[in-house]
Amino acid sequence: MSWPGRVRRGRPEASKAAALVEPAAAPVERASPGLAALFDALTQDGRHSVLDLGLAGDRHLRVLSRFARQIRFAGFIPHPPEGDAWTSALEALPPNPCRPYDVVLAWDILDRIDPPQRAGLVERLVALTAPDARLYAVVDASGAATSRPLRSTLTGVNRVSVLPVGPPKPARTPLLPAPLERVLAPFAVTQAFTLRTGLREYVAVKRS
């Protein structure tokens, strides 16, 4: 058999293998009334101090730098540490030496960690933040059976680009409004928005 014949015979197997490879996900940009409400309460003079539980990015930083000169990225989203590494990461999260953080971007961290970890996270945020700190969080209340880790990037004060960065995983039980308020205390929910996609966005303010 000629060499070209052998190549042709191998192509179906190559095509089959290629079909098993998950295609790269594309980012999806959406409006965010929760972020709009958060930023509307801030001043664009650089005085704020931001703790972002996600990752840094140029476009993301351009939006935040309108409001803050001091920004720390924890890197807990999209892939939070697990087990003892989670506890160590929380303990290692440093305070801002100049002034306590007064803005927290928590993204969908509450969907990504177990209930005991949620309590530890909020306790650490309370220790690191100013008395009137504001917090933004989003949870998936769609009831979907699976969810994917997401990387969120600010594209404006009222828009966010969301990129899936991992395979689907079984979704946790949706965190409903009343349990979420208990989880976040002493951050008190002041505004909540339900999106058509089933997401719920929350803005909360720390109370003494």
Question: What name fits each language-model region?
Answer:
Residues 53:
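Conserved beta-strand/loop positions that form the S-adenosyl-L-methionine
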